[in-house]
């Protein structure tokens, strides 16, 4: 029996076993309910029911904004992969290789050029799945290149921020990207080109101390964590309890740090409207079809007999004129 139970039965189970995808279900962080992954993906990674906004990858984000889900990928300049030869538990170059294999991205920022409701725009997206969306030399170069393209095309520049801050493996070289991107923002401002920032969950650290909080209009997704230092660090520093909802998008909106909190489903139309307002462009022409009214049969009005007037006598026809002799 040992041979049957220990050898044969496991082999039969392996034959009959069906592999289940790891990402078949997603657990909502807000409600704790399990949701079918395809339903969440089809809903732009917003949990149906709870409306919790999950993190969204760079490619999926660009697809959700650009017309026809098409755009031109912007070639980004190469930078030194590991200038400091940094190593902690693992080598920095190995971490980059793993992040590239996981996300399919070259670095944490992806830049595209296309049309948003037929309006040309340049969009840069930070992907939190690539080493926490951290700001390094490659990410800084990508953002600056996107701003330069916006200047060249005379197009608005839109940035979706999602980051844990500066990339510590690059030291002062990553911190240098903060003033570089700030100079890029100033160039857009001098050219009178709109710079719109969408703060997503999370946006923290040195990113919030530079380009992420310098937009002409600051948008945020519902419930996004936005701040410089963590809440626990602040509480330990000031020795006070922070208010409820501190560093969330709604709290920042109520205290003047964010202009609008926009649901992800409304972001596309909101961004297009802002671009047209800030550039003083006419609204997109929408063909309005007015349905033809259906003819209504007139109801017959019955009058009393005494109110009905007799028809007028027919006038005698005039004799034809006699031509002159």
Curated annotation (Swiss-Prot):
Q: Which keywords does the record carry?
A: ATP-binding, Cytoplasm, Fatty acid biosynthesis, Fatty acid metabolism, Lipid biosynthesis, Lipid metabolism, Nucleotide-binding, Transferase
- Keyword Protein transport attached: no
Lineage, top-rank taxon, reads Bacteria
Q: What class of enzyme is it?
A: transferase
Q: What does this protein do?
A: Component of the acetyl coenzyme A carboxylase (ACC) complex. Biotin carboxylase (BC) catalyzes the carboxylation of biotin on its carrier protein (BCCP) and then the CO(2) group is transferred by the transcarboxylase to acetyl-CoA to form malonyl-CoA.
The UniProt subunit note reads as follows: Acetyl-CoA carboxylase is a heterohexamer composed of biotin carboxyl carrier protein (AccB), biotin carboxylase (AccC) and two subunits each of ACCase subunit alpha (AccA) and ACCase subunit beta (AccD).
Question: Family assignment?
Answer: Belongs to the AccD/PCCB family.
Name the chain's protein. Answer: Acetyl-coenzyme A carboxylase carboxyl transferase subunit beta
Organism, as annotated: Rhodopseudomonas palustris (strain BisA53)
Underlying gene: accD
């Amino acid at each position: 029996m040992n041979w049957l139970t220990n050898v044969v039965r496991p082999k039969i189970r392996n034959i009959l076993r069906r592999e289940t995808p790891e990402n078949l279900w997603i657990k909502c962080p807000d409600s704790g309910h399990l949701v079918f992954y395809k339903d969440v993906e089809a809903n732009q990674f917003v949990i149906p029911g709870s409306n919790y906004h999950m993190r969204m990858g760079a490619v999926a984000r660009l697809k959700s904004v650009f017309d026809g889900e098409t755009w031109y990928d912007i070639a980004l300049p190469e930078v030194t992969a590991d200038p400091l030869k940094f190593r902690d538990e693992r080598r920095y170059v190995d971490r980059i290789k793993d992040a590239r294999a996981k996300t399919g991205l070259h670095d944490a920022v992806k830049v595209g050029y296309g049309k948003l409701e037929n309006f040309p725009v340049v969009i840069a997206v930070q992907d939190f799945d690539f080493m926490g969306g951290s700001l390094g030399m490659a990410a800084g170069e990508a953002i600056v290149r996107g701003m330069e393209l916006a200047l060249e095309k005379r197009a608005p520049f839109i940035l979706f921020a999602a980051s844990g801050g500066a990339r510590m493996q690059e030291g002062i070289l990553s911190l240098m990207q903060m003033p570089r991107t700030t100079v890029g923002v100033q160039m857009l401002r001098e050219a009178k080109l709109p710079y719109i920032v969408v703060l997503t969950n999370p946006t923290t650290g040195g990113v919030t101390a530079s380009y992420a909080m310098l937009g002409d209009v600051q948008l945020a997704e519902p419930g996004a964590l936005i701040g410089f230092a963590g809440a626990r660090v602040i509480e330990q520093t000031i020795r006070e309890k922070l208010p409820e909802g501190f560093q969330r998008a709604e709290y920042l909106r109520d205290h003047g740090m964010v202009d609008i909190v926009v649901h992800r489903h409304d972001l596309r139309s909101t961004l297009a409207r802002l671009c047209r307002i800030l550039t003083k462009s006419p609204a997109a022409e929408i063909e309005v079809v007015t349905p033809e009214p259906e003819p209504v049969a007139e109801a017959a009005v019955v009058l009393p007999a005494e109110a009905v007037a007799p028809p007028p006598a027919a006038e005698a026809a005039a004799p034809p004129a006699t031509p002159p002799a």
